[in-house]
Amino acid sequence: ERGGQRLDLTPPAAIVVPAVSTVTAPAPAPPEQPLGKFQMTFYFIIHEAEMDGPRPAGANGGAANDNAEVSLASVGAPLTVAAPAPDLVPLNDQACVPLAHVTRAFAAQVSMQGTGKLRDGRLVNVATRCQCGRPCFHIVPSHREWGTGGSGRSLVPFRSVAVDPAVVKMGSLLYIPALDGQRMPGPRGVGGFVHDGCVVAVDTGGGIDGHQLDLFVGRRAYYKALARRGGSHSWSKRVEVWSGSGRCEQKGGKLRRTAAAI
């Protein structure tokens, strides 16, 4: 007791502090790295009918893989054999068996572009292995509407690029500021959208060397539509290319800019 009053020496009740839950912050996106200045060129599916016009007379109505007939009846042989029109050359498969006979000009273009559509509707891609003395081709499955790249992945207009694998790793997401904000030509579902600059490296090519990339644009008409005044593509001759790993993403088979980068 103190001063006639009893002192309460009971210790105060402990103060309970509620536990604080720890929230783990998402890992920061990897920093974007500049890859340097690149020359950007373009490639597309070359259409036999658009390039060659009507098939030369004598080529059996213009079917891509039909041949002119040569009759041997005049020399006593009751036999009719097929022979290609003199200005046509074969597009061989990997077994060196002709898939079609086409003009030399179309053969040269489809070898350079990598993908072509024949008059009969078949889509052909350059094959990676060939022992025929000239480029070989294979028929592209119908569900791959735009062909395939060197990686085996489907090409997508305005999103797929061909690169030199010694400079850019296959499968890399890239960001090209020169494309960002440009409206792409073509109907909705193919083009008709404002580009966000995101592309992916899925293809290669014999003509792609060093700091060069080739943007797949689908059709020749879309390539022409990307030209500036006077039909010039000079705007693409020297463009900045960045790693897109922190800005671009692929979800559900679609390539787009990440929400954080919008």
Regions found by a protein language model. Name each.
Residues R2-I262:
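Solvent-exposed, well-ordered loop and adjacent helix/strand elements within mature globular domains
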